């Protein structure tokens, strides 16, 4: 490629096509920036903007107040002893896995774990034992399955796994497992537990200490109204010296964080949104009520919600026999739903999906959720004689 003026025209400022739509994409609903974060994005957008008064360690910067955010606010918010800001939830998971295990060791994952949990384990050289779920329709995860998995690893390898992980909730069905019971089971075998709260931290109340988790992971760009990539990591006092160990070459830098992590706009948008994020977590009961109301509306139309019932999270998975039947009868039917929703200024269901899809009701409120539900009903009626 020749980098001449003509070829460079496709780059530069690019408008976002979906901006302003009613957004039901589970990846995006919890990451929409607050007004304060949008201002911070411009104010702190330069690469190393937060380093005007840096003494060499990101989380020790006091102006802006990154130190207080990381060492005072985040531990309280996450319910942990020590916390750090990272470049994302997957980076947080890898930091824990890499510091807790050695190549060839084992880790236990739930059957609904995100792909990045597997990849993080793979990158750390760990073997994976999976706790199976019960399958359709609820995909229930039995806490006792962790005990079985730990015993299997111990029998096969001669020693217990170095870590167990539970996804809370999972990113497919929005199920919230009994993490407290899982923690108890794991601790009976002296196996520490990592709570993957990428869809939890910043949306709903959660405390690592109350659950009994030794580690907690969150995603700023997925659930804390921050500009990504940015995440959080909370660690118990017992394991903090392991995960946050210092480099022998640069004595103030933490090895697993490669010294410093989220700099500039990422950490500052997270900080800017934090007051509102704390407040919205207190409104979680209303979010659950809205999700259940929306699910009931869709099920009245013939949709089938998979996963836990009654549901306790904004992320939901639906089977849509009505939409799928339409897609089989019309030209280019795979894409009809995406086009119909786009015409109604609704974004979030991926192009080509009609039989199964997931969505999120987070932050929309009853009025916008009503618009989405009404739109689904209108689309079904539009094609009922096809």
Curated annotation (Swiss-Prot):
GO biological process: translation
Reaction(s) this enzyme catalyzes, per UniProt: O-phospho-L-seryl-tRNA(Cys) + hydrogen sulfide + H(+) = L-cysteinyl-tRNA(Cys) + phosphate
Cofactor: pyridoxal 5'-phosphate
E.C. no: 2.5.1.73
Function comment: Converts O-phospho-L-seryl-tRNA(Cys) (Sep-tRNA(Cys)) to L-cysteinyl-tRNA(Cys) (Cys-tRNA(Cys)).
Annotated HAMAP family: Sep_Cys_tRNA_synth (MF_01675)
Family in the record: Belongs to the SepCysS family.
This protein's name: O-phospho-L-seryl-tRNA:Cys-tRNA synthase
Source organism of the structure: Methanosarcina acetivorans (strain ATCC 35395 / DSM 2834 / JCM 12185 / C2A)
């Amino acid at each position: 490629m020749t980098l001449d003026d003509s070829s460079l025209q496709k780059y530069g400022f690019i408008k976002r096509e979906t901006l302003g739509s009613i957004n039901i994409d589970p990846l995006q609903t919890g990451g929409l920036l607050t007004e304060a974060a949008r201002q911070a994005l411009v104010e702190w957008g330069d690469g190393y903007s937060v380093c005007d008064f840096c003494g060499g360690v990101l989380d020790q910067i006091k102006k802006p107040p990154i130190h207080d955010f990381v060492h005072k606010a985040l531990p309280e918010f996450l319910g942990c002893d020590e916390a750090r800001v990272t470049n994302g939830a997957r980076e947080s998971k890898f930091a824990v896995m890499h510091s807790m295990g050695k190549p060839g060791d084992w880790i236990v994952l739930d059957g609904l774990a995100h792909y990045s949990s597997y990849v993080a384990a793979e990158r750390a050289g760990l073997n994976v034992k999976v706790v199976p779920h019960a399958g359709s329709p609820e995909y229930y995860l039995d806490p006792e399955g962790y005990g079985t998995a730990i015993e299997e690893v111990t029998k096969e390898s001669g020693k217990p796994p170095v870590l167990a992980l539970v996804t809370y909730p999972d990113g497919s069905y929005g199920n919230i497992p009994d993490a407290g019971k899982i923690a108890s089971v794991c601790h009976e075998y002296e196996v520490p537990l990592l709570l993957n709260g990428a869809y939890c931290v910043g949306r709903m109340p959660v405390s690592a200490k109350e659950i009994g988790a030794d580690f907690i992971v969150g995603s700023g760009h997925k659930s804390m109204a921050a500009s990504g990539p940015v995440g959080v990591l909370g660690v118990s006092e017992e394991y903090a010296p392991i995960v946050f160990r210092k480099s022998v070459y640069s004595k103030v830098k933490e090895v697993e964080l490669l010294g410093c992590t989220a700099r500039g706009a990422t950490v500052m948008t997270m900080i800017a949104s934090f007051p509102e994020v704390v407040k919205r977590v207190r409104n979680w009961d209303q979010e659950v009520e809205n999700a259940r109301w929306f699910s009931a509306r869709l099920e009245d139309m013939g949709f089938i919600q998979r996963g836990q019932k009654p549901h306790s999270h904004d992320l939901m998975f639906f089977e849509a026999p009505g939409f799928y039947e339409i897609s089989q009868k019309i030209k280019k039917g795979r894409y009809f739903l995406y086009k119909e929703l786009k015409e109604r200024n609704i974004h979030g269901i991926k192009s080509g999906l009609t039989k199964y899809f997931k969505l999120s009701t987070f932050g929309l409120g009853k009025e916008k959720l009503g618009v989405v539900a009404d739109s689904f009903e209108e689309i079904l009626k539009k094609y009922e004689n096809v």
